[in-house]
């Protein structure tokens, strides 16, 4: 069968068009890839073959961006319009929230918005650190390399951006181009969260199962306050099978998109969610809320209750108290003049009827010794992880840069005494690991995985405000004493 005809059949079978529309669909495809058609010759998806055909027909230049833009234009044909997508989604919602997210996620996989093939390239494994914490490690290989033309375009970009950012509603159906994300096949579910219009979409390069984004339809900065907790509860009521959380709203400890209010969620049980309570806390005015300090490398207070109003009220008071709490002996400073340094990373999930809220305490102070952040991965870890510790990593899933896949292969050669091109930045760590282990061809992969787990444990320890040692426990006690005195 000819490639154009095959893809036209796929478009019609998707339900986006009717059989009567076949000639129309074929002409839409021809407008994108050229009139010359060919017999399919391999097992590659028809859309991918059509992109190759478009290059051959000189409809597009042969570069990463042009291929990506055309790919998404083709899959847009196989995707219901935004209004139809929303209509189907909310019809299914009447039966089951799981059924409608199953349907929407499959749609986003089938139309290649969720890059399933690229995501499968990621390195993923888990392990238990010497401190007893279960952790997950990923090396991110799914995002495509930067197109040189896109880099140049971004460097020379002037004037007002459209869309204003990568999370704005205006991305839905946006063609994209050099320096701009292709989003022809993006669909966003419209929803109401606590009286405000929000959107719900999936992440194209997912870091975990059904990785989704909830975004304010208005381009406003991120903020963590009582409204945040209200919003998280509202989302959990709609999607109880998903967790939802927010990155912190300050630089260094926050995510990379502070300019647009949004949350992340999905269907994944992170290590932090499975971690137990190491010390219970009593709040007399909140008998329906079970509270405690979580046994975790970062500083996490957990609140659990089937009464969401109590949870929101107590959680908001804890956030406000932390925002103004200082312990200068431990470099914990709430303010420097008018500059706020404290916030939290709030994360919520459901356990039956209970709402479980984790409030991870964050501090973005810097010092001469730690210019990138006192509570940020320290310099000896930068060869593995230098980037900010955001929501996903807070919960125990490392997102490590793609460069490490090849670099760590060279480290393994070094351990085995083979010729290698190991980066100098890894040498001190590699020597330490080698001195502590009998490394052979049989166990070198296991040693590498365990060593990365230990590095990630230390990354999280560095980001925690109260360390997992005697001094950290004293710091926790001092904080909890002051907190429970303030909140009866």
Swiss-Prot record:
InterPro entries referenced in this protein's UniProt entry, alphabetically: GalP_uridyl_Trfase_II, GalP_uridyl_Trfase_II_CS, GalP_Utransf_C, GalP_Utransf_N
Keywords: Carbohydrate metabolism, Cytoplasm, Galactose metabolism, Nucleotidyltransferase, Transferase
Subcellular location: Cytoplasm
S-adenosyl-L-methionine found in the keyword field: no
UniProt pathway: Carbohydrate metabolism; galactose metabolism
Entry GO CC: cytoplasm
Any one Pfam family match given in the protein's UniProt record, by short name: GalP_UDP_transf
Keyword Membrane included in the entry's annotation: no
Protein known as: Galactose-1-phosphate uridylyltransferase
